[in-house]
A protein has these predicted regions:
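Short glycine-enriched nucleophile-adjacent loop
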Residues: 107-118, 124
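Conserved HGGG/HGGXW glycine-rich cap/lid loop of the alpha/beta-hydrolase fold
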Residues: 22-71, 75, 255
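Alpha/beta-hydrolase fold catalytic core
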Residues: 1-32, 53-56, 94-97, 131, ...
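Flexible "cap/lid" loop of the alpha/beta hydrolase fold
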Residues: 122-168
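Conserved loop-alpha-helix segment in the C-terminal half of the alpha/beta-hydrolase fold
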Residues: 227, 231-270
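Conserved alpha/beta-hydrolase catalytic His-Asp/Glu region
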Residues: 161-220
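Catalytic histidine-centered segment of alpha/beta-hydrolase-like enzymes
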Residues: 267-283
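Active-site loop/oxyanion-hole signature of alpha/beta-hydrolase fold enzymes
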Residues: 15, 22, 50, 59-105, ...
């Protein structure tokens, strides 16, 4: 991979939180926003941003609790709050319509935003952003609210008592990242780690994200409501899935039928992080979609 020339950093305020984003320049081009997934950060999009910056004004936020953005007071993180932050950022940028590309949690945020403001989004790419597959949701639905709330309380207390993992070096943290995603190259893992860790007072390194972003809240995921929201999306939508991923196939499980204008790309030899695992394939598919 060629050397990446970095973007500039900026900040904005949402719900009294100071949130960070990077800007890849080319302000006269159409706006395109890349939204990362959970426990990730803005610089995980660097390879994609660098490929798109020639034709687009690429902006990439760190979601609250991630990267160089502030952590939420109380460690409370929900999709509506992330959507609020993206709405605030886009209003600060003040350029519509916008193209959104999101991965996982970021894909869910992009889908929710577009359902609320369909006239503001020109095109949408969601990499495994539809949430848990229906079979997984069915298993969760069997638990009553008090059991889900009890599990949430125990999880919150567990995270409160747990010290975040520390690594003696960046190389050690990068090795952990490779364990998490064996599709990554050593170069990719190191780049993601360099931008994903902060140095602690004792000289060790820790991930920048707030551990509380891992907490699963007890509210049920309402598939009927989600399908109604997806049906509000008016723009062309590209759904991307890795064939080696845990995420369900939205054609096989029927979720794609909720969209007005959507198609699916299943990428071979890719897991959940399709844009890392098969970068060239991802760029080719997204480039063709955006050029239509």
């Amino acid at each position: 991979m060629t050397e990446i020339v970095g973007p500039t950093s900026s900040y904005y305020i949402s719900q009294r939180l100071r949130l960070h984003y990077v800007d890849w320049g080319n302000e006269s081009a159409p706006p395109l926003v890349l939204i990362h997934g959970g426990r990730d950060h803005a610089r995980s999009w660097d390879w994609v941003a660098r490929a798109l910056r020639r034709d687009w004004h690429v902006v990439v936020p760190d979601l609250r609790g991630h990267g160089d953005s502030a952590w939420a007071l109380g460690g409370h993180y929900t999709v509506p709050e992330f959507v609020l932050d993206i709405a605030q950022l886009l209003d600060v940028l003040g350029r519509f319509p916008v193209t959104l590309v999101g991965h996982s949690l970021g894909g869910a945020v992009a889908l929710h935003y577009t359902a609320i403001y369909p006239e503001r989004v020109q095109k949408l790419v969601a990499i495994e952003g539809l949430g848990p597959p229906p079979a997984m949701l069915e298993a969760l639905r069997e638990k009553p609210r008090w059991e889900r709330t009890d599990a949430w309380i125990r999880q919150v207390r567990d995270f409160a008592a747990r010290l975040p993992r520390r690594y003696p070096s960046i190389d050690a943290a990068a090795a952990r990242m490779l364990e998490e995603n064996p599709f990554l190259s050593a170069e990719q893992a190191r780049h993601l780690t360099v931008h994903g860790v902060a140095r602690n007072e004792d000289g060790t390194y820790g991930w920048k994200f707030d551990n509380y972003v891992r907490v699963l809240f007890p509210e049920r995921y309402d598939m009927q409501e989600a399908r109604a929201a997806w049906g509000r999306i008016a723009c062309p939508t590209l759904l991307v899935r890795g064939q080696e991923s845990w995420a369900g196939d939205p054609i096989k499980d029927g979720r794609i039928t909720a969209f007005r204008d959507a198609r699916l790309v299943n990428v071979p030899n890719a897991g959940h992080w399709v844009h890392h695992d098969q970068l060239e394939v991802f760029l080719r598919e997204v480039g063709a979609f955006l050029a239509e």
